[in-house]
């Protein structure tokens, strides 16, 4: 029996591979299928959009052509076209597409949130007066200070006289116009 040197364990083939740098991420076949199915559903959502909504989503020319073709096709051909769109989406970064689609879906919710913020700002304008006017001017520099102050004065008079809040509504409309012009 021959005696092996002390460092014979260091010479094992394949031992020199660094495990930290070359970490392999194993993905199951079912996870790949779930991801593919989800991208196919995303493609179907995009196909169901109208032309105006489709223009707001960042799509390259090939994908746009495939989507427009799927909108014209019916029945079994449509299913195959949706699979093709899902395959095309797997080869692209879909995050900007998802964000644009979410923005389209949540437009109503965003408007409701904006209206609540504008209502709160209107109420602060009526209660605080000039301090809140400065905040409005910092948000929207093109706002008319004189018109805003006039509306606030009228709203305070209406509130004290228990009259309908006509000026308060006008303040809200003015703030909404400022917010819409900003977009």
UniProtKB/Swiss-Prot annotation:
One of its GO terms (molecular function) is ribosome binding. Its main location: cytoplasm. It is found in: Cytoplasm. GO terms for cellular component: cytosol. InterPro entries: DarP (IPR006839), DarP_sf (IPR023153). One of its GO terms (biological process) is assembly of large subunit precursor of preribosome. The keyword Cytoplasm applies. Member of a network of 50S ribosomal subunit biogenesis factors which assembles along the 30S-50S interface, preventing incorrect 23S rRNA structures from forming. Promotes peptidyl transferase center (PTC) maturation. NCBIfam families: PRK05255.1-1. Belongs to the DarP family. This is Dual-action ribosomal maturation protein DarP. It comes from Citrobacter koseri (strain ATCC BAA-895 / CDC 4225-83 / SGSC4696). The gene is darP.
């Amino acid at each position: 029996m021959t005696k092996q040197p002390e460092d014979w364990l260091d010479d094992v083939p394949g031992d020199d591979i660094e495990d930290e740098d070359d970490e392999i991420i194993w993905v199951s076949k079912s996870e790949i299928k779930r991801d593919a199915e989800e991208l196919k559903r995303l493609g179907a959502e995009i196909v169901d959009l109208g032309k105006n909504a489709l223009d707001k989503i960042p799509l390259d020319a090939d994908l746009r052509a495939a989507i427009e073709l799927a909108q014209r096709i019916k029945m079994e051909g449509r299913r195959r076209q949706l699979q093709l769109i899902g395959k095309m989406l797997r080869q692209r970064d879909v995050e900007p597409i998802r964000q644009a689609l979410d923005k389209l879906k949540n437009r109503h919710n965003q408007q409701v949130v904006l209206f609540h913020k504008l209502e709160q700002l209107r109420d602060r304008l009526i209660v605080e007066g000039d301090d809140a006017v400065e905040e409005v001017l910092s948000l929207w520099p093109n706002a008319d200070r004189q018109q805003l102050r006039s509306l606030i004065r009228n709203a305070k008079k209406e509130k004290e006289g228990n009259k309908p809040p006509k000026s308060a509504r006008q303040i809200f409309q003015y703030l909404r116009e400022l917010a819409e012009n900003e977009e």
